[in-house]
Amino acid sequence: MKWMRHVALATALTLSAPAGVWADTPPDQLVVGLSMNNILTLDPAAISGREATGVIANLYDTLVELDAVDKTKVNPGLASSWTIADDGAVTFTLREGATFTSGNPVTAEDVVWSIKRNLSLGLVGAGVWSSFGYKANNIDQFLSANGNQITIKPAQPTDPQLTLAIFGKPDASAVIDKKTALSHETNGDQAAAWLKINAAGSGAFSLTRWSSNEMLILTRFDDYWGEKPQMKRVIYRHMPESQTKRLMLEKGDVDVAIGLSVPDIAALSKNPEVEVQRTPSSGFYFLAVSMKDERFKNPDVRLAIRHLVDYDGINKVIMPNYGTKRLRPVAEGVIGSLPDPDYKVDVAKAKELLAKAGYPDGFSVRLLTLNEPPFADTATAIQATLAQAGIKAEIVQGAGDQIYGPMRERKFEMIVGRGGGGQEPHPHSNLRALVINPNNADDAKLSGIIGWRTSFYDEQLNDMAAKALVERDHDKQKAMYEDIQKRYEELVPALQPISAVVDSVVYRADVKGYQNHYGWTVRLRSVSKQR
């Protein structure tokens, strides 16, 4: 197809680029090249996306840490231990001696305040809590501190293992230094303005400098309670262009490169001076429409679009090193996960459906996408196949908030995006992000839930997911999650997964201890340089 030829030409040009001359970054500093377009804030309650989560995971701690390799394993964090009661309540015991970078001790009060703050602000991180029934006006009934212990009771029937996992997610449960934060409160904002550009955590590193879309510098916290960081400093440098990151890595100006294009990863994989780490991540690359739009309320229009995406071609040409083909809203390998449906491009069928819906000549639509790989290439591929049925897609590219902002406000038409949970090895993690929508009203403002953003709502699916979550019989639960995926497909939802996210990170061969994380919480305290 025409779009494939364009991608192939770009690949050939990139692979032919000459390598630079190697230099060395300082032995006690880790320099990371990545796009900072989606790092819009440093407030844990407001972050979203891989890059911002990775930064926050090094500035703040959580009560537990989800193991980077074994998805079924939960490790101690600020909590040294925990117990799960028969009624599903989880009680954490704080470790002794942990302090914030300010020197203030980490207390149970800090933990409780951080969670209540998250809910009261109602930003992205609150979406996780609200999907489990916790609200700003009811959290006092379920969350409490007693000495060095924190207890959370279930607000609604749920799997306690998922409750436990929430406390390993920085966006939901990063522990903030209450005393320091409130000393910078303005007009009762709970330090929202200050924490947007500052940090008050107990993580392995402290914030030294942040220049938006330029540079972010972290400095080792020498009194860190856990494993002492090997690096004195971590420097994130804004590099939205893949070839720039590749050349800087080859020259030795950066140690780690995140978000490289497929051609650049392919070229670097042949270089003995670097290593490529490919790890399963979480979430999906997807195409979504807004069901607030009259055209996309019609299931025939949505079904037509399903027939106008070249899933095989996109995954073969664009997605290697970014993702692997996945068309279901549940990650492979979890309980009840179904094989992919056999969706193919069928222009004739799409035209028939559009005519039935009242659009025999198609229509025009704005297609939002980030201006970086693989989003822009995927949007171009979709634009080409949509055009075959008369749908004229105008691609609008931009940085993070320019693209995801309209989606969070439910003021978009069509978008190529990335997301969808999966930070916990459980189908509910994906369903919570993509399928379940507790309240479809505009004023619900559930901006952390993609189902709400797309205005997709099905009461029956909500009920099915709630019942599957609490089913303790393995075979019954498996069948229930299979039925959920079948109904989702039948409804022709507003969001169609295209590819399951794979994280490919390239780093200098002398960098040791770097470990990608499926939940994006890449902690850098274990990283060293072998020179």
Ranges and model annotations:
Residues 37-53, 75-78, 104, 157-174, ...:
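A structural "hinge/loop" feature
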Residues 80-125, 151-153, 245-248, 295-297:
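Aromatic- and charge-enriched surface segment that lines or borders ligand/interaction sites
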Residues 211, 215, 308-336, 371-383, ...:
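Detector for C-terminal structural segments
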Residues 33-86, 116, 123, 198-204:
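N-terminal lobe/hinge region of extracytoplasmic solute-binding protein
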Residues 31, 107-114, 147-153, 203-204, ...:
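Alpha-helical secondary-structure segments
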